[in-house]
Every structure is written in C-alpha cells, then in structure tokens.
C-alpha cells in the first residue's frame, strides 16, 4: 500500500478509490502523480526540476510496492530526452497536446515481479481496421441530450467506467466534464470528454462501447455531435485511448478522421484482470491559437 511521509505530500483521495492524486516534494524534486489501481498504472505530472534518476528510482519503488504494470508521463520533446536517458521508452505522441507543441508519451513497463522490462516497452502491431461509410445523418429513433451536470457524469462513470475501460487522464476531476447522452427506446449510450481550455485539447471516451452492429452508427453520430460541441468551445485537438482489440470502437474513430499516433503497451486492465495494449487515436478539429490568459492578467 502506498504511503506518503509527512513533508513529502499526502494523498488527495482515499486508498479505496480507483484513482488517487498524490503530491511529492523533497529537496529539489517536485511532482504530482495519478495512481490508477484499476489499470495498474501511474501517470507522472513532472515540474521539470530535480534529478531524473532519483525520480525513476522513486517510481520503481512504487511500482514494486503497488504491483503496477506501468509508469508513464506526457512531456514536451526536450523533456522526453531526459526521461529516455533513465530508461523510459517513447510510445508515441499526442499532436497539439500543448496547443503549440506536441506531447511525447514516455513509459516504463514492469514484469509481474516488479522489475523494469529490459529494452523498454515491447512494440505492438496494429490491428486491421475496416473502412466504413461515415454516419452523417442522425440514425432513426436516436435522441440526443447535452450533459454538463457533474453529479450525473460522476454517476455515469460509476455505472459504466469499468466496463468501458475508462481511465481519467487529468488531475483533480476523474470524470468527463461534458457528455452526449443518446437514447434509442430503453437503451442509453454515452460519449464524454475531459476538456482542457488552457491548452485547447480534450480526451474523448465512449462510456458505453458498441455491443452490436447498430450501436456503431449511434455512437459515431453521437461522437460527431460531441466534436461539434468541442469545436464550439475552441478545442483544437482531441484524442482517445482505445483497447487494441476493440475493433468496432477503432472503426468509429477511423471513420471520423482520427489517426493512430501512439501504441501503448499494457496500458489498461480488463475486468477479468488481463493486461491489454491500447492505441491513441488523434484528430485536429480547430485552429491552434495561443493559450488563453487568465482574466486577471
């Protein structure tokens, strides 16, 4: 179990929650990290100070203690070299993640015994995704609702997050802040987004993955409607992390013009406990303008 000593930061959420936000500061090392127990990984938010080898050793200890499969960070190009020098591997990029700069995903994967895999993260082969006709007209019987209510969105994640392999990507809020609810008869569908107005990007998720052929059309149209909402919010770049073998979900993103920009080894854990690789699908939807400045400046 992770423990954080006084003066080194404290857990922001209880150890019973799937995702915990922690802060660590000691000497010249200062960073934040998200511990995701459900998917056995940890994301580092680095403040670019301190010795990288000491940081790596710190995360190696957490990985062994917590039984983690993976530690990763999302950084600009110049910082990726420092992480690579201490044993992290580049698994791909998120174009436009920092609005005017791309992000690089640097990862360290561990064995079942908690030892770093020698040679870096194993490479994944891309599955074949069929090309399909875009769904530009609303499918018959589908009604849509735009949802921003935080309590409703938290409930959607509680009810559907595990089955949808949902994994929060940002700090402080562990659910989408905007979503489209679709309904056909008695069936509900949800697609959501975690937005970042400072950098103009959003992570999008299907919180109810397709279960049958007709679901694909419904979810694609809903995703298209969500992209329209994000564009109206001046979002420039969107991305999604999709399990490697979720071919139907991948087909939706492919139809919407997304491209694979990263292949992530053992990035998620299925409900039965099996590790699964993932692909990061990306698309630019708007112009990359300068970051928004706070109103008090």
What are these regions (language model features)?
Residues 82-83, 252-254, 258:
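Conserved active-site tyrosine of GNAT-family acetyltransferases
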Residues 49-62, 214-231, 251, 255:
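Conserved acetyl-CoA-binding loop-helix of GNAT-fold acetyltransferases
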Residues 2-14, 32, 37-48, 117-169, ...:
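Short amphipathic alpha-helix that is part of the acyltransferase structural core
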Residues 72-80, 240-250, 267-271:
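Conserved beta-strand-loop-alpha-helix junction that forms the acyl-donor binding cleft
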Residues 74, 89-105, 259-274:
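Conserved catalytic-core motifs of GNAT/GCN5-like acyltransferases
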Residues 63-75, 231-243:
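Conserved GNAT acetyl-CoA-binding A-motif
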């Amino acid at each position: 179990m992770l423990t954080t000593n006084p003066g080194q930061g404290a857990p922001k959420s209880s150890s019973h929650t799937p995702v915990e936000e922690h802060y660590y500061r000691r000497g010249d090392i200062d960073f934040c990290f998200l511990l995701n127990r459900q998917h056995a990984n940890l994301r580092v938010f680095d403040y670019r100070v301190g010795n990288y080898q000491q940081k790596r050793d710190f995360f190696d200890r957490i990985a062994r203690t917590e039984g983690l499969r993976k530690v990763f960070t999302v950084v600009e190009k110049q910082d990726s070299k420092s992480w690579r020098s201490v044993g992290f591997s580049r698994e791909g990029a998120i174009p436009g993640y920092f609005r005017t700069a791309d992000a690089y995903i640097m990862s360290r994967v561990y064995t079942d015994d908690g030892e770093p895999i020698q040679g870096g993260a194993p490479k994944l082969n891309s599955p074949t995704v069929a090309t399909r006709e875009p769904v530009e007209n609303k499918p018959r019987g589908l009604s849509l609702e735009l949802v921003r209510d935080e309590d409703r969105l938290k409930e959607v994640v509680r009810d559907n997050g595990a089955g949808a392999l949902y994994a929060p990507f940002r700090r402080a809020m562990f659910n989408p802040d905007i979503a489209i609810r679709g309904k056909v008869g008695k069936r509900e569908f949800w697609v959501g987004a975690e937005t970042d107005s400072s950098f103009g990007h959003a992570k999008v998720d299907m919180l109810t993955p397709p279960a049958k052929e007709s679901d694909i059309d419904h979810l694609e149209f809903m995703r298209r409607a969500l992209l329209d909402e994000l564009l109206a919010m001046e979002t420039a770049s969107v991305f999604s992390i999709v399990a490697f073998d979720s071919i139907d979900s991948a087909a939706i993103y492919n139809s919407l013009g997304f491209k694979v920009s990263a292949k992530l080894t053992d990035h998620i854990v299925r409900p039965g406990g099996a590790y699964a690789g993932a692909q990061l699908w990306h698309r630019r939807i708007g112009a990359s303008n300068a970051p928004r400045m706070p109103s008090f400046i």
